[in-house]
Design a protein with these regions (language model features):
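Cytoplasmic-side transmembrane-helix entry/capping segments in multi-pass membrane proteins
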Residues: 319-325, 346-351, 372-382, 403-409, ...
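Soluble extramembrane domains flanking the early transmembrane region of eukaryotic membrane proteins
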Residues: 2-286
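Hydrophobic alpha-helical transmembrane segments and adjacent interfacial helices
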Residues: 327-339, 357-367, 382-397, 416-421, ...
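Membrane-helix interface "capping/anchor" motifs
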Residues: 311-320, 340, 364-377, 422-433
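Core alpha-helical transmembrane segments of integral membrane proteins
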Residues: 289-365
Length: 570
């Protein structure tokens, strides 16, 4: 058996190797995959057929290797031996192992398998490092592997958290590893720094091909620095855990580069990816991101918002209903979400009812009392909320200062309150601006229920902050790609068109309509006293309803036959 294995290796050595960044050839032999350092390779794993990966001709100046394998959503197992041991194997969609080379060793192997019933498409690569490079996960005390270069990823609706094990200093072949926690000076692993990178996949692209292609840009240090965005730099004293805002349906790849500033060397962990949704389960599936209830709710909301964008100031009571709906609905949703465990559809239905009540109440306040101050205060606060949300949607929202809830909410509230105060002397302009900006933004929210757009997170991030305490520590980075530029242009075009149209339309007209209740009362008194007014002779409502009912009854009454029906007298 050993002779047969050597014969197979001799045959492999005689075969030409493919050049380029990725090898896409099939198996070199049945159950055996040959790899080259720094070369990606595509292959398919099946459940009854495990594969063995082999790397030959390893240079003598290489002290350790990181072999990593990736798939889209199906789990793959990588191990040092055929027998799976907790400290020598890993299972997941993005997994890797560190192989510490022995003196004179020039070949190493790994075992690859999957327990999934369907074939799994994978891409894998072995990367080599020297004794001067730090070892990712070399001081692991939290996870199962002895040396763990993997990034562990957890997500929920609010945030996505990555965790990784601390690195250790590199060392020569055959030497003992440096101690992890005995010293804390510049001669120990405490001098290492960790750069956390984030890379966004193309929006609305959930294909396996796109993921495996873009993962190749996040495996090696130079490509990571050139392609991804550095979010934060951690020191050895910081906790090796970073949180990000969850972007449901948007593919994101994370990686960490550990740097040794003393030797000016670096190494990359194994990148991890997520869509913050599932490809397997029915609930929260990536292929059906928008719920039917969300689509119905935000579509109707957008239709009303589009009407308000162009005609809100002219139809004043309709605008008050719209603004009151937003004002009450937002706070009601936060309240019942934090106090109850109701499902999303029930929460949305109750929010719609509460918002409608709030809208009717605000319109009724204006109709009965005719006071502009509370109505325009509500309108101005809604506009201020949108302006404040846009402010924290910028990189300003990632400042460490605003991770404190008190500072964040005080600053947020001050910006929201300043907006109506600034426009105190020009209330009509305030109202028209609110109609144009808020009404047009409702269209953006409706688009998000059908198609992912980062602009929806302008307000969703604030909602998450109000609902989830731990969201305060999350980075709020979002992609800004072609779709977002198009939707931003649509939002701006609608807002500018609506504001311009209403300003031109209202030129020369009264700033606001007169008091509705006084008009109604004056009209009623006029009809009572003026007998020449035709409306004076209109019967009361009760008599008119009785008359209508009598006419309806006549339609169903059986028609009497004509002619004499009594017998003739003799």
């Amino acid at each position: 058996m050993g002779l047969l294995r050597l014969l197979v290796l001799a045959v492999l050595a005689s075969e030409p190797r493919a050049a380029g960044g990725a090898e896409t050839v099939g198996n070199s032999s049945e159950g055996l995959l040959e790899f080259s350092v720094g070369k990606f390779r595509y292959f398919t794993l099946k459940r009854p057929s495990p594969e063995e990966a082999i790397l030959r001709h390893i240079s003598s100046n290489v002290t350790f290797l990181i072999f990593q394998i990736h798939s889209q959503y199906q789990n793959t197992t990588i191990s040092f031996s055929e027998t799976l041991l907790p400290n020598a194997s890993g299972t997941g969609t993005d997994k890797g192992l560190v192989f510490i080379l022995r003196p004179e060793q020039s070949m190493c192997t790994w075992h690859l398998a999957t327990l999934d019933a369907k074939p799994v498409q994978n891409v894998a690569i072995p990367l080599s490092y020297s004794e001067r490079d730090p070892i990712p996960g070399g001081c692991n005390l939290e996870f199962d592997l002895d040396i763990d270069p993997n990034i562990y990823l957890e997500y929920n609706f609010f945030e996505t958290t990555i965790k990784f094990a601390p690195a250790n200093l590199g060392y020569a072949r055959g030497a003992d590893p440096p101690p992890c926690d005995i010293q804390t000076g510049q001669g120990s692993r405490w001098r290492l720094q960790y750069d956390v990178y984030q890379y966004f996949l193309p929006e609305n692209d959930l294909t396996e091909e796109a993921l495996l292609t873009h993962l190749q840009r996040m495996a090696e240090v130079p490509q990571v620095k050139a392609s991804a965005v550095k979010v934060v730099t951690l020191t050895a004293n910081d906790k090796t855990s970073v949180s990000f805002s969850s972007l449901r349906g948007q593919g994101v790849i994370y990686n960490v580069i550990v740097r040794d500033p003393f030797l000016n060397t670096s190494a990359a962990y194994v990148p991890a990816h997520t869509y913050t949704c599932s490809f397997v389960t029915t609930e929260g599936n990536c292929s059906s991101l928008g719920r039917v209830s969300s689509k119905v709710f935000f579509t109707l909301f957008a239709l009303l918002g589009l009407f308000i964008c162009f005609f809100g100031h002219r139809f004043w009571k309709t605008e008050l209903f719209f603004m009151g709906f937003i004002f009450v609905g937002f706070f009601f949703y936060i309240l019942i979400t934090r106090l109850t465990l109701l499902t999303y559809d029930v929460l949305l239905a109750l929010t719609a009812v509460a918002g409608s009540v709030g809208g009717v109440f605000l319109a009724a306040v204006w109709w009965r009392f005719g006071v502009l101050a509370p109505c325009l205060l509500c309108v101005g606060l809604v506009l201020g909320f949108l302006v404040s949300s846009v402010t924290f949607f910028t990189p300003l929202g990632n400042l460490k200062l605003f991770r404190d809830d008190a500072i964040f909410w005080v600053t947020f509230s001050c910006i929201a309150v300043v907006i109506p105060l600034v426009f105190t002397g020009c209330l009509r302009i305030l109202n028209i601006l609110s109609c144009g900006l808020v009404g047009s933004y409702s269209v953006v929210l409706a688009i998000h229920s059908y198609l992912y757009t980062s602009l929806s997170y302008i307000t969703l991030n604030v909602l998450k902050r109000a609902l989830h305490v731990d969201f305060r520590g999350a980075f709020l980075n979002v992609p800004f790609q072609t779709n977002d530029f198009i939707i931003l242009a649509v939002w701006g075009m609608l807002a500018v068109s609506g504001i311009t149209f209403q300003i031109r339309r209202e030129r020369g007209r009264p700033f606001f309509p007169p008091h509705p209740y006084k008009l109604w009362k004056r009209e009623r008194e006029r009809r009572v006293t003026n007998i020449l007014d035709p409306s004076h002779h209109i019967p009361p409502l009760r008599e008119r309803l009785r008359g209508r009912l009598a006419q309806i009854k006549e339609l169903f009454r059986k028609e009497q036959p004509a002619g004499e029906r009594t017998p003739l007298l003799l």
